[in-house]
Amino acid sequence: KMISSVMKYKGFYIARYEAGLDKTSKAIVFKNASIEKNNTITTNANNNETMNWYGLYKKIKTFTVGNDKIVSSMIWGCQYDAMMNWMAKNDKLIGKPDNSKINSDPNGITGISPDDVLNNIFDLYGCHREWTIEANLTNYRSRRGSDYGQLSLYPTFRGQDSPSSTDPAYSSRATLYIK
């Protein structure tokens, strides 16, 4: 369905921010995920539902429940690649580390660093590595990008981990497409 939609409408939407968690409702939030007292980025969530691949996949799919025209999904690996290619075509440095842009605060507010933004998409150089739907080998899922502790990584970096891993440096980014 996603591929048909992309072909028909000539694209898809990517969340500007990494996924966060509303402390009270446990709902996924994206914009300024930790600015308000009731929201937190996944590093602070201490909640397996949002720190592992399975939990984030399930939560992000519920972001547009009730909307019969739009579907939300965890970002696919090919969508992440498309985002990186789009940025590279617009002269953005994405293929090697740029430590001047790194967001090295694991508890930092999502989207607060003016340097860690490319084409209005935040936190690609730091904060969290991002889970994707992409499979890697038989038992793993791909995670992309850098995190607050990995100054040698870069936005196009591809790694893998078990989907049940609960590393606090992992988050994800949602995509939206039209039905």
Language-model segments: residues:
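Short aromatic-cysteine micro-motif
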Residues: 1-123
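Disulfide-stabilized, aromatic/cysteine-rich ligand-recognition loop
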Residues: 21, 47-64, 70-71, 75, ...
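Surface-exposed, flexible loop/turn segments at secondary-structure boundaries
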Residues: 80, 136-137
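Residue-level recognition of short, solvent-exposed, well-ordered loop/turn junctions
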Residues: 123-124, 169
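Active-site-proximal beta-strands of protease catalytic cores
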Residues: 125-134
